Amino acid sequence: MEDEAHEFFHTSDFAVDDLLVDFSNDDDEENDVVADSTTTTTITDSSNFSAADLPSFHGDVQDGTSFSGDLCIPSDDLADELEWLSNIVDESLSPEDVHKLELISGFKSRPDPKSDTGSPENPNSSSPIFTTDVSVPAKARSKRSRAAACNWASRGLLKETFYDSPFTGETILSSQQHLSPPTSPPLLMAPLGKKQAVDGGHRRKKDVSSPESGGAEERRCLHCATDKTPQWRTGPMGPKTLCNACGVRYKSGRLVPEYRPAASPTFVLAKHSNSHRKVMELRRQKEMSRAHHEFIHHHHGTDTAMIFDVSSDGDDYLIHHNVGPDFRQLI
């Protein structure tokens, strides 16, 4: 150190004033350093004082709330106002508008806490907005009882017994109950019983409508004596006494003895016909024949009476009428 100062004094030419000036500068620098240190001490003391005045916060707070230095937490009143405002906005929007907003933004709206209080959702699972499950409306199934599987062999046997039997409905019903197998359900007998009741009603109606004079006789037309007709009609002897063909002609005033249906058992080709024109020709021929027979009979009766008359007029008749050989020329 001393060697360096000695070299400095011998190698450098400097004045005393310069040395003094340099010392003054050093003093200023020292004063600046002292001032800076004083200022630093003052700032440190003030910071320590402000830190001492403020209450110290620890990690565990008595009220159980922890705050972060980077997050600004609003007060409770401000949070209530924000929630109230969001509720008003949600209520003012209709479900259609909410759905449109969801489609535009691509995010679902806030779920209703009342409807989703059951099971918590998994935050990791993401559900798509557009669901592919489309429910198709279907017709509700009826609650009517389904018919059980029927035994066709037993049913055919019962039907053959029903159609081949000439007895009444009650007898058929009892015979079918006897022939029905014990394992068959009662549902199989219900339709047959209904059919038997209907057939029995038709048979009773037919028995009532049959004429009382002949219990075993079948109904026949009183004009053509046929027993096969699709419908019985009213005639001169009362309702349901003529067949369909004869009843139609009777209603129109054209029923004559010469008319007979072709299927009538009393049909004679020389006397009857089912054509109106042919019937009129037969009637005309019949009337002409009857008139001719009446004329011949009347003329023959008159001649016989005049010949065998014993009165005085008999001679005049013989004179004026040339009956027998004329003998006057011989006299």
From Swiss-Prot:
Keywords: Activator, Cell wall biogenesis/degradation, Developmental protein, DNA-binding, Metal-binding, Nucleus, Transcription, Transcription regulation, Zinc, Zinc-finger. The keyword Nuclease does not apply. GO terms for molecular function: DNA-binding transcription factor activity; transcription cis-regulatory region binding; zinc ion binding. Belongs to the type IV zinc-finger family. Class A subfamily. The keyword Metal-binding applies. Residues 34-47 have a biased composition (Low complexity). Residues 116-134 have a biased composition (Polar residues). It is found in: Nucleus. GO terms for cellular component: nucleus. It comes from the Eukaryota. A zinc finger (GATA-type) spans 215-269. Residues 30-49, 105-138, 174-218 are annotated as: Disordered. It holds the Pfam family GATA. The gene is GATA12. PANTHER family: GATA TRANSCRIPTION FACTOR, PROTEIN GAT2. Expressed in the vascular cylinder of roots. Expressed in the differentiation zone of the root stele. It comes from Arabidopsis thaliana (Mouse-ear cress). A motif (Nuclear localization signal) lies at residues 139-146. Overexpression of GATA12 induces the formation of ectopic xylem vessel-like elements. This is GATA transcription factor 12.
